[in-house]
From Swiss-Prot:
Residues 323-384 are annotated as: Disordered. The modification N6-methyllysine is found at residue 311. GO terms for biological process: blastocyst formation; ribosomal large subunit biogenesis; RNA metabolic process; rRNA processing. Residues 320-384 are annotated as: Required for nucleolar and nuclear location. GO terms for cellular component: nuclear exosome (RNase complex); nucleolus; nucleoplasm; nucleus. The keyword Nucleus applies. This is WD repeat-containing protein 74. It comes from Mus musculus (Mouse). InterPro entries: WD40/YVTN_repeat-like_dom_sf, WD40_repeat_dom_sf, WD40_rpt, WDR74/Nsa1. Pfam families: WD40. Keywords: Methylation, Nucleus, Phosphoprotein, Repeat, WD repeat. Isoform 1 interacts (through WDR repeats) with NVL; the interaction is independent of RNA or pre-60S ribosome particles. Isoform 2 does not interact with NVL. Interacts with MTREX; the interaction dissociation in a late stage of rRNA synthesis is required for appropriate maturation of pre-60S particles and depends on the ATPase activity of NVL.
Length: 384
């Protein structure tokens, strides 16, 4: 593993093959990190979050229901704990006041004592937030407050230090013009800075803003984009707009104050799985099923800044918030130990290229054969 330069990685990406990848954009270099040295699809990375000590530690949520603690400074896995309860994969991870917060597909949200990492330990708190959860998101200002949303599971806000009932429960929009119920499918949510408002994106290509302070529990603003389900969302550095991505790789910036489209970003070729903006720079990191990590500039001029192919399907990402991207010391690169699955992929492509070369005829030999055939023909003969 490349551990000496791990602290200078700009983006951390979780893959479907269970690999945590650290990407240095200045060097166009990606390092692979696995606790056992071999990738396993049973340990696919579904959720990532920073530890409470800044950006020195990463919490890695895997499909086998283990949460691994990764030292981002040294590039090593420190420990892990098993978090049972409910069914499905992690839909959100968070840390708050010495506790670990997990939430899974089936709607079981649990709070664990972080100091006790034994598998047999019981959770400090368990909440049933409803089935079909798509996302659990922590309030960055009040770390003990989280929001959950999902399919046929309306947006809810929970105070983990209060009662076991949500402090806010969103209400579905009114029936459509045929007086039919509108289905619920909230894919992602974000807390808006400087207020109690929340914004969600839906599987029916809508962006909605909710205000828990308002007397109504329905959205106070709604906008639509495209025709395909929205799968991921992130706030821009100014906090006045969001960037959403859909299942066809389309990215768009929407002003949630007026509900209008500000612009689009191009380049993706598959469903978007992860989006995150830099807190101070006009940069957006995106990843998805096309196995490519992209960094876009979201302010004039808009465009693609970096593009790194990472070989595996990408599920989630973390973008470093530091500002000194260009001022890093140039450390010697260590040889990267590529897991066996990536090595097999390279060998497969190499064999395909070799087979293609064997099938192509030699141009010189073909021309020589044609000339010999012409010389052997008798005078006055005509070609068929």
């Amino acid at each position: 593993m490349a551990t000496a330069s791990a602290r200078w990685n700009h983006v951390w990406v979780g893959t479907e093959t269970g690999i945590l990848k650290g990407v240095n954009l200045q060097r166009k270099h990606a390092a692979n990190f696995t606790p056992s040295g071999q990738p396993r699809r049973e340990e696919a990375v579904n959720a990532l979050c920073w530890g409470t000590g800044g950006e020195t530690q990463i919490l890695v949520g895997c499909a086998d229901r283990t949460v691994r603690y990764f030292n981002a400074e040294e590039g090593t896995f420190l420990s892990q704990r098993y978090c049972p309860g409910g069914e499905g994969t992690f839909r959100g991870l968070a840390q708050a006041d010495g506790t670990l917060i997990t939430c899974v597909d089936s709607g079981i949200l649990r709070v664990w004592c972080e100091n006790d990492k034994e598998a047999s330990s019981d959770p400090l708190l368990e909440l049933k937030v409803g089935p079909g959860v798509c996302r659990m998101r922590q309030d960055p200002t009040h770390t003990h407050v989280v929001a959950t949303c999902g399919k046929e599971n309306a947006l809810k806000v929970w105070d983990l230090q209060g009662s076991e009932e949500p402090v806010f429960r969103a209400k579905n929009v009114r029936n459509d013009w045929l007086d039919l119920r509108v289905p619920i499918w909230d894919q992602d949510t974000q807390f808006l800075p400087g207020s109690q408002k929340l914004v969600t994106c839906t599987g029916y290509h809508q962006v909605r803003v909710y205000d828990p302070v308002s007397p109504q529990r329905r959205p106070v603003l709604e906008a639509t984009y495209g025709e395909y389900p929205l799968t991921a969302m992130t706030l821009t550095p100014e906090g006045n707009s969001v960037i959403v991505g859909n299942t066809h790789g389309q990215l768009a910036e929407i002003d949630f104050r007026q509900g209008r489209l500000l612009g689009c970003l191009k380049g993706l070729a598959g469903s978007v799985r992860g989006l995150q903006c830099h807190p101070s720079k006009p940069l957006l990191a995106s990843c998805g099923l096309d196995r490519v990590l992209r960094i876009h500039r979201i302010r004039n001029p808009r465009g693609l800044e970096h593009k790194v192919y990472l070989k595996s399907q990408l599920n989630c990402l973390l973008l470093s918030g530091r500002d000194n991207w260009e001022d890093e010391p140039q450390e010697p690169q260590e040889p990267n130990q590529v897991p066996s699955e990536d090595t097999e992929t390279d060998e497969l492509w190499a064999s395909l290229e070799a087979a293609a070369k064997r099938k192509l005829p030699d141009l010189d030999q073909t021309q020589g054969a044609l000339q010999r055939r012409k010389k052997k023909k008798r005078p006055g003969s005509t070609s068929p």
